[in-house]
Amino acid sequence: MLRLVCAFVLVAASVARADAWKIETVETPGAVRELIELGGEPRIATASGWFSVVTDGARVRLEKAPPPRFPPIPTDALPDGRIAAGKREFARAWLAEPTNRYGHGVLGDTIEAGALVVERKGGRRETVRLGNDSVFEDLEPRIADLGGGEKIVAVKSYLAAGSALAVIGERDGQFAILAETPPIGAPNRWLNPAGIADFDGDGAVEIALVRMPHALGRLELWRWSAGKLLKVAETGDTSNHAIGSRNLDQSTVGDFDGDGVADLAIPSFDRRSIRLLSFRGGIREIARIKLPAPAATNFIALASQGSPEILLGTADGKLFRLHR
């Protein structure tokens, strides 16, 4: 196996706490095309093929790796969708029943999902099917522990009113949409989830989303409590998606200030800076790290010597490592 040991070139960084966070260029064999996680392990695609990522103390190594092998896609699944794996009650879930009834095309084509399929651990499948007034404008359902049990978070878009965030789970023995945020209010208006965690340390789980990441860039925090979604915080100057891209994970969750509470790493509205945000006791910017070009790939969270790190690619094909 060919092994590539990466060299790191320090780049000037504009940060809110310059002594705490750095940005380094990771020299790669060719332009970076894609960052994914496969079985919990990071994989990076460049013009020269696929590489795995290995942390070694204060350094990161890229090792040549075979192309990833994804599980077979069910016949009813969205063609460009991804299968989500559960940990407890659910085996997996996917978006299904492709439809072209909503022509927004923000994710690269006008084919969206008309249904969500959940497969239990024993193999039994349940389908949540939408009416003709809406679609799932998403690529992968997010399985998360909300309120003591696994539930699914997905983007539901109304043909006449735009996107809402939907929480799907079991009610009276059947799967259904348990709650959703109000839709944006106009067609072709979309939102993108950014992270799911207890962001303020109160024991309840919040869902972070960016409302209209291409036109408004408003980050909102919605708490799941007693079967309902309650907006508890919001701020501007964020984005986690580029129009037409299938990269929906341009953000990541980690404890970036060391206080034991989850924080959020997310691009600024122009995607030329990475903002590290804390929500404990109010919204606070831990650091703002300037990028040489707009963020373009999914983010991958790493841990080196007990500290969180972030890998991401930019629109000019470069790979960057953000760390303390």
Which residues fall in each region the model found?
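Sec-dependent signal peptide recognition
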Residues: 1-7
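Hydrophobic h-region of N-terminal signal peptides that target proteins for export
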Residues: 8-18
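Beta-propeller-forming repeat regions
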Residues: 18-324
